[in-house]
Amino acid sequence: MPGVVMDNTNIGGAGQGSAIHDSRNGMPSLTPNINRNSAFGDSHVGRVHINGMTKNAVDPSQAEDASTVNIKSTKSMELPELPHITQGFFPFSKLISRSVQQSWNDLSDLITEMADIKVSPQEQNSLQLPASGKSFGNQSPENLRKKARILDFAHAKRAEFIKLLVLSQWSRQAADVSKLIDLQNFIRTRHQAYMGALQGIGDMKRDLVQAQVANPDLTTALEVLSKGKVSSMSDLGYKPPRSLTGKDTLKRLQKINRIISVRLALYDSVPRAFHSYSIHDGRVTFVVPNEFELDLSIGQEDESSQLYFVDIRFLFNPSSPNLKGRIFNEFDVKINDALRNNGLSGCFDLLHSLVLTNKINILFKQAMELARGLWYDVLRVELLHRTLVVHYWTQKAGAKSWLEIGIKSGRICGENDSYRHPNLGLRWIRDGQEVDSEEIEFNTKSLSMESILRSVIALHISHILSSAYCIISESLLYSAGRLSLQAQLTRTEPGDCGLTIQLTESRHLSVSIEPMSGASIISATPSAQERLDNDRSSDKSSAEDIAARVARLRCMAAIDEIESNVKMLGFETVNPRSLKIDFRRLFPNNVLRFSFFWHHLWERNWIVAATSSMDGDNWWVVQLQTTTTAESHSVFDASTHISSTLRSAQAISGSFFHVNQNIGYPSFADLGHYLSGILAVHTNARYLADLQTVDFYPPLQRLVIEPNLQVPEIFMRYEAANIPEVFRIALPSGLKSRVRTKGTIRLAFHGVDPCKKVATIVAYGNLLIPIKAFSALNSTRDHSLVFQKRGTGFAIRLLAPPGRPVIPKLMENLQRLDCILSIFECLQRKKMETRSLSLSHVTFAYGPEKDLLATLKIETSMPSSSMELDPIFLASRTKSLFHLRLGLSFEFPNPHRRIQKSIESTLNHSTTDAGLDTVAELLLLTLPLMRALDQILMNPSNRQPLRVQVTVRNAKTFQIHYPGQSFRFQLVATHHLSHMVWILKELSSPKERSSQDQLKLRLRERLYNSKGDGWRGLGNGVVAETGKVGNLLTELDRCFEASSTPGLTPEVKASGSKSFSQQLTAENGNVEGTLSESATLIPTPNATSTRHKTGDTTQNADIIMID
């Protein structure tokens, strides 16, 4: 019994006691004696009581009578010592130390807790003193909570130490209480001994009753042994009957048979159960199927006499084939009594009731053997009166199931029950509900409790599996026949019941139920099965639980199959938790499993999701909205999507694969291809939907992968007049913008180029103008534009990574196409021959023999950042994103390459005298001039001195300078008499030409006052036709050839040629300018600034010095 023992220093007051020998559980303590009484004198010896014992103590009150003390001590030694109870006692000091330690720990925790409470500073208004002059202090909720915690701690600890004080006062009398405990234990032990003795005597008396034997009759025994007879038994004098022969015996038996037959037919009331009988051998045999055969006979010829029992045989198994001995005698007595008292009906009732009871007992014994054998711990058997109750699946959670086998009365309410009799009946309680038991295999002839149980369990399993079958078949995947579902059910063998379920095209699942325990068994992937076993719910029925587990497992199998195969195609699994987005709200409620994938060829703000449910497997495209633009990487970096938000999500398919498609690596390769395609198409459809200014078809909800894994196409309406302002491109001057394209553009996906990491999307359209004239002009260098050979169709190729919209590029290219067609029409008007067309350039031939080639380059500038092309950003923008600029390039030996920049500046000016028409006219106008300059500047040996320099002010103004003679001329194209002519004027000052009178005279005679082929002098100048200006320049050059003045030195020419090569290369971006080996580019004072200001007049063009 637990208790508290005071320490040595606390018993009888502080400082008392000497060496104390503790005795616990009757054993003396081995602690050495330590003298603690030196300060109080050696004469004082303290007394310590431990469990009623006194050691080394002398009572001062007994010191007066020493003899009395000795007598009492002697008597006490003769009595046995009471056993001492000390279990559960512990020192009071330990209780105090633990209480103090606990108080210290609680105080430390309190201090830590109060340190975590942040007290808000008190406002200045609360610092005002009240009328009493006493400050209330800080009255913030945090400070008040701190004070309350301190008070609660102090009160709690105070209560604990008050309890310790009470315990300390009680423990000072612990010695007396310990004696009382020992005495109570002694009395209880004695009482139990007395009660045990009485019980033993009663049991002996009861057992001796069976040993009683009656006194033997020795007198009768002695007479029998000596005389062989008993005189007390009278002799009736009967003579023994005469022995019968075989013939007599047969006659008597036949007579008995007739008597029995007549009696049963006319006199006796035979119950319905005994209507099947046979008469033979002097007896009648009544047959009750599956129960017994009863042989009866007569003792007298009188029809009113009773029938007598002869024999009985049971017709069911297991049973005793023949009754012998005491049991047979018991049957004889009971049956004869029943026949005498109640006739055949009473006999049947007795035997029928006996057989029914016997059958129930047999089934009970079989059930007990099963419960002790293989069915251990899964069966519970009870026999209530004549009703056998067998509980099966006892360890299964939920509603219980059991089988009751008992005796039914056979009566039906409202019907005639004269022919009804009791019989064995079944009552089946399945999951707490009584159900019909007609289908249970119950053979009353061959009794087998195991067969009955197996039939009941088979029916129960069939019910569970059929219910699960119905639940699963309601889902769309199985009701539509896309996945197979088969059930095998039986009434007798539970092990043959099962479900075969197709999870995916390549995976199947079998469901069965263990007959003994009732646990459902699902044969699937081990890892998935382990996870599913933890998901079982006791609140669901077995069928619902199986259906739920099958649904989860099917979805897991579908997602696992997708994950394991698409990874081989370069897809990367994306953890949805890293995106900080609740995708459960995105998908329908019936989705059980989902997984996200990303491919390194895709844009980082697009992913695809595979979702699986019992109604179907779907692919989704998911668009993420990121705050930062991530660079392209081969690995999906979740850190760049921490702050991502969900922008859109759309289902794109009703299944992972085509229904008739064989699952394998080729099918997954096609799937990866078409996922990229649907992502590319869906990206552009989503872009058009967000743009809200361009109509398209089909809508996003219907933009799904077709059943044969074909990527759908988009049809968008394109009208040049309704193009959003941000996408509109202003055509250069001279180009006419008109409707040349029909209003419908078809976008189709044409694969992914893994080398370039782009998807190919082709835009198909039709022109409103015939294309026979330029259908064969497709460029061999740029395949982004193709025209149909027959018809009006065209195709534009667009390249972009899957996930990046091509709509801005399509808008640009369609307007480029309009620009190209406008250029083609302009060239046709100018009688120039177009050689090739593409979205980036137009190559054409011009000249009298169409032997000179020029290329018009169409260049467009657009934002490089994808954020600037976002529809949300474009909604607030009114300025166009695109700026178109035309460029012009000439190939060697085209003479116009010398004035390329001047012509380009004219091409892009917005003035009325600029544009493509003006450039075409300039090319035709300046062609004879440029060819003449080529002839004049021809220097095959590259060793002749530099004689002439040509400065191009613009395409219509040239300055010709002969530095050796200090003569300058200006050649200007102007209108004269409604047609263009070239006019040559001298610009040299009198100071420069003062020493060249002879040359001046020659010029006047041969040019100014002369006339030639296509030119004529004007006195102070020369006018020439545009086609004959070469003759004028040839004659001018002959005048200076006659001069003997030497030109520039070769060193000067070489340096000039070098500077021309460097400058022209910097301007044209190639080295074609170096073909004129004696040309020098010398910038005028305004040339550098003018080169960057295309809006200025052409008077400030570059200056080209040509030798």
Curated annotation (Swiss-Prot):
GO terms for molecular function: transcription coregulator activity. It is found in: Nucleus. Residues 1-28, 1081-1107 are annotated as: Disordered. Pfam families: Med14 (PF08638). GO terms for biological process: regulation of transcription by RNA polymerase II. Its main location: nucleus. Component of the Mediator complex, a coactivator involved in the regulated transcription of nearly all RNA polymerase II-dependent genes. Mediator functions as a bridge to convey information from gene-specific regulatory proteins to the basal RNA polymerase II transcription machinery. Mediator is recruited to promoters by direct interactions with regulatory proteins and serves as a scaffold for the assembly of a functional preinitiation complex with RNA polymerase II and the general transcription factors. Belongs to the Mediator complex subunit 14 family. This is Mediator of RNA polymerase II transcription subunit 14. It comes from Aspergillus oryzae (strain ATCC 42149 / RIB 40) (Yellow koji mold). The gene is rgr1.
